[in-house]
């Protein structure tokens, strides 16, 4: 456990995570200073009076006088003010680093471009099914520091690439990178390898590394070693097995669960289940209770969630598909009897949309593209694409055209922030309109 007594601590970024950092230091007898680039950041009204605050920008004077800077994942380490502090030898960490220095129970750590919230929640459910006192959070739900508890027997953390950049003390009992596809290229000017390098930090000092046999970018730089366990569609220690029209989860040659017993559907969810099972096994959770959790878990909202089935038409909310890889996962192996009406658009974060093109062939696809990068997406297949300014306009355009057997799928391949507060608001708006129009 680290000693912060007498340290001049500056926290960048408020919100729930920033407040958890403030509480962490106050509990240890240290009064930090707080700054935020927003004029009225969320949580400002909850700051104790004794805590000095600076809003509407960064305070370079405070930063250069600090002994320790705790940076929000929302601010790039390449920001000139942070670069100057780093050059001056000032330590810069994030909330996950503070957490790792304190945590007394084993940590299962999960990252990846897509599927990480589902896998994190699933491993948490597996632990609960085994009667283990588990804390689940990080980049999903509660900030990690709010999970710290002497009674906790296991922590399951979802970690973003931004969080991993400022973390060096993680020693996970089991760690995974589920997949690596283009995302956040606006924060990684040197491209995919720079983004991957941030993700790879999760394996440092990990006891077991759970890698994706179908994605070489998830492997440690030096290649798979004795710490590695793999999962994949057809390859890997944990893989899918197709026999006589049925699909099984298989571990090292042994069939352990028929997927028809699961509430989750879709190949990407079956591989998520394999990854979760590999992590749970590595963390020492009993296999039987882990499999039981797989049969009861219904999935998370906004992740290929059927929000309406009416007149033979399925309306599916996959608003969490905020990058190209996530939309690819939704379209890969998707079977629709009639026409797929696909809603795409938003802020593409400088991504390359071309990998989607191969899923958009055929006579039964219609594209409805909206938002900031709608024109780029419509260009993938212009002859079947229509462009609108908003998602609502797109849905009102397609609604009279749907027939029994069709699917309306919101899987935008983009962030929502050009028109919505977050992906949840976008998904809720889709669900509301589906119920009105369907």
Swiss-Prot record:
Gene3D superfamilies: Mur ligase, C-terminal domain, Mur-like, catalytic domain, NAD(P)-binding Rossmann-like Domain. Its main location: cytoplasm. It catalyses: UDP-N-acetyl-alpha-D-muramoyl-L-alanine + D-glutamate + ATP = UDP-N-acetyl-alpha-D-muramoyl-L-alanyl-D-glutamate + ADP + phosphate + H(+). Its EC number is 6.3.2.9. One of its GO terms (cellular component) is cytoplasm. GO terms for molecular function: ATP binding; UDP-N-acetylmuramoylalanine-D-glutamate ligase activity. The gene is murD. It comes from the Bacteria. Pfam families: Mur_ligase_C (PF02875), Mur_ligase_M (PF08245), MurD-like_N (PF21799). This is UDP-N-acetylmuramoylalanine--D-glutamate ligase. Cell wall formation. Catalyzes the addition of glutamate to the nucleotide precursor UDP-N-acetylmuramoyl-L-alanine (UMA). GO terms for biological process: cell division; cell wall organization; peptidoglycan biosynthetic process; regulation of cell shape. ATP binds at residues 112-118. It comes from Escherichia coli O6:K15:H31 (strain 536 / UPEC). Keywords: ATP-binding, Cell cycle, Cell division, Cell shape, Cell wall biogenesis/degradation, Cytoplasm, Ligase, Nucleotide-binding, Peptidoglycan synthesis. PANTHER family: UDP-N-ACETYLMURAMOYLALANINE--D-GLUTAMATE LIGASE. It is found in: Cytoplasm. Belongs to the MurCDEF family. Pathway: Cell wall biogenesis; peptidoglycan biosynthesis.
């Amino acid at each position: 456990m680290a000693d912060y007594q007498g340290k001049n601590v500056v926290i960048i970024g408020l919100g729930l995570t920033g407040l958890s950092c403030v509480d962490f230091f106050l509990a240890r007898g240290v009064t930090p200073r707080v700054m935020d680039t927003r004029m009225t950041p969320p949580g400002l009204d909850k700051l104790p009076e004794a805590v000095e605050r600076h809003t509407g920008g960064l305070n370079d004077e405070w930063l250069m006088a600090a002994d320790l800077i705790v940076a929000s994942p929302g601010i790039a380490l390449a920001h000139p003010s942070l670069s100057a502090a780093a050059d001056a030898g000032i330590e810069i960490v994030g909330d996950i680093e503070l957490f790792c220095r304190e945590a007394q129970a084993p940590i299962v750590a999960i990252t990846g471009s897509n599927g990480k919230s589902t896998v994190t929640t699933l491993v948490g459910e597996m632990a609960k099914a085994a009667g283990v006192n588990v804390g689940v959070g990080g980049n999903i739900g509660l900030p990690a520091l709010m999970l710290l508890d002497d009674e906790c027997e296991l922590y399951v953390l979802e970690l973003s690439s931004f969080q991993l950049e400022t973390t060096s003390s993680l020693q996970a009992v089991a760690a995974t990178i589920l997949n690596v596809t283009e995302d956040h290229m606006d924060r990684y000017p040197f491209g995919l390898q720079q983004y991957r390098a941030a993700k790879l930090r999760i394996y440092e000092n990990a006891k077991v590394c759970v890698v994706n046999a179908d994605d070489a970018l998830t492997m440690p730089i030096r290649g798979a070693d004795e710490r590695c366990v793999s999962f994949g569609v057809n390859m890997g220690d944990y893989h899918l097995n197709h026999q006589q029209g049925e699909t099984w989860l298989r571990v090292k040659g042994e069939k352990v669960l028929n997927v028809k017993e699961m509430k989750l559907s879709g190949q990407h969810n079956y591989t998520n289940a394999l990854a979760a099972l590999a992590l749970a096994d590595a963390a020492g959770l009993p296999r039987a209770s882990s499999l039981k959790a797989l049969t009861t878990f219904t999935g998370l909202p906004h992740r290929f969630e059927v929000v309406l089935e009416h007149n033979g038409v399925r309306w599916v909310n996959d608003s969490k598909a905020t990058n190209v890889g996530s939309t690819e996962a939704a379209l890969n192996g998707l079977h629709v009897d009639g026409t797929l009406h696909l809603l795409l658009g938003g802020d593409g974060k400088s991504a390359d949309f071309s990998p989607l093109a191969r899923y958009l062939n055929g006579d039964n696809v219609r594209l409805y593209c909206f938002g900031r990068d709608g024109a780029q997406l419509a260009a993938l297949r212009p002859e079947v694409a229509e462009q609108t300014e908003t998602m609502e306009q797109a849905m009102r355009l397609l609604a009279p055209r749907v027939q029994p057997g069709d699917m309306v799928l919101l899987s935008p391949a983009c962030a929502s922030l050009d028109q919505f507060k977050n992906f949840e608001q976008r998904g809720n708006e889709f669900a509301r309109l589906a119920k009105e129009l369907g």
